[in-house]
């Protein structure tokens, strides 16, 4: 219990009475030595409006400003002084003459004559305007305008003759193609001419012809030791084919039927017969 009593007596008693009071140190006031000063106070001047007549300074300043001032209107436009540049003319490139505003030319002497004492420049008259120079397509100068017009007319005639000129083909194949173009049916009514047997041989112009070309990169791997068996897709045999036909013969039968059908179609148009009913008398 003694420990508990000591604990309570320590924290429950009045702390202010038990603790010793700290002494506060007062700051010492720094005393400055008093210095004696002689201050003179003047009596103020009486207030009032100064008279213009008796004020000499004001009269002198007013007189100076009146002498310096000039009667100027505040609302008048401001005038600026500009320096006008004198036009000295320009220099010609071809002969070096200097042309002034008075249409007078001053010739510049050569450098050899500049060193001489006589450096007087005499004005010369203006040269007349040069005539226009006409040139052809090759760059040659054309002096006569009539000759130029004749050349243009001849050129136009030559172009018209070229349009009317018909080219004659020399090779046999070119002549055949030219004849086909000349005798081509122009009206386009081939279907109506069913009695004409030659219509079966006329090619339809509306169908587009495919251009056949050989693929060099793929033709290297094609069978080339014998005859390729034809098929409806025109696919050649491979390079490693041994030449033995192992198919069931469907492709050959299909192609044979196609050729027979086309042949019968042409034959029926050529040898077509008509039954004519003739009345008995």
From Swiss-Prot:
Bias kind Basic residues: ranges: 20-29
Compartment(s) where it occurs, according to its Swiss-Prot or TrEMBL record: Cytoplasm; Nucleus
Keyword Iron-sulfur: no
InterPro entries (alphabetical): Bud13, CWC26_splicing_factor
Superkingdom assignment: Eukaryota
Residues forming coiled coils: 142-181
Major location category of this protein: cytoplasm
Known partners and oligomeric status: Associated with the spliceosome.
Family of this protein: Belongs to the CWC26 family.
Protein name per Swiss-Prot or TrEMBL: Pre-mRNA-splicing factor CWC26
Organism: Candida albicans (strain SC5314 / ATCC MYA-2876) (Yeast)
């Amino acid at each position: 219990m003694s420990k508990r009593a000591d604990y309570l007596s320590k924290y429950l008693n009045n702390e202010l009475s038990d603790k010793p009071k700290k002494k506060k140190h007062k700051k010492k006031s720094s005393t400055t030595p008093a210095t004696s000063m002689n201050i003179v106070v003047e009596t103020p001047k009486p207030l009032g409006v100064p008279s213009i007549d008796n004020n000499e300074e004001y009269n002198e300043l007013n007189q100076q400003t009146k002498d310096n001032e000039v009667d100027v209107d505040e609302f008048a436009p401001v005038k600026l002084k500009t320096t006008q540049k004198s036009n000295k003319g320009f220099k010609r490139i071809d002969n070096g003459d200097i042309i002034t505003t008075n249409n007078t030319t001053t010739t510049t002497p050569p450098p050899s004559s500049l060193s001489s004492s006589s450096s007087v420049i005499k004005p010369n008259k203006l040269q007349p305007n040069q005539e226009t120079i006409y040139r052809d397509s090759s760059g040659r100068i054309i002096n006569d305008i009539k000759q130029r017009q004749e050349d243009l007319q001849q050129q136009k005639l030559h172009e018209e003759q070229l349009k009317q000129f018909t080219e004659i083909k020399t090779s046999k194949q070119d002549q055949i193609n030219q004849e086909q173009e000349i005798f081509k049916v122009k009206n386009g009514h081939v279907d109506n001419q069913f009695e004409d047997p030659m219509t079966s041989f006329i090619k339809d112009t509306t169908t587009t012809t495919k251009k056949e070309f050989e693929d060099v990169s793929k033709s290297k791997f094609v069978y080339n030791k014998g005859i390729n068996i034809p098929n409806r897709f025109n696919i050649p045999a491979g390079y490693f084919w041994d030449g033995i036909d192992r198919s069931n013969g469907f492709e050959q039968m299909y192609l044979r039927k196609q050729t027979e059908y086309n042949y019968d179609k042409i034959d029926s148009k050529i040898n077509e017969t008509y039954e004519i009913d003739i009345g008995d008398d």
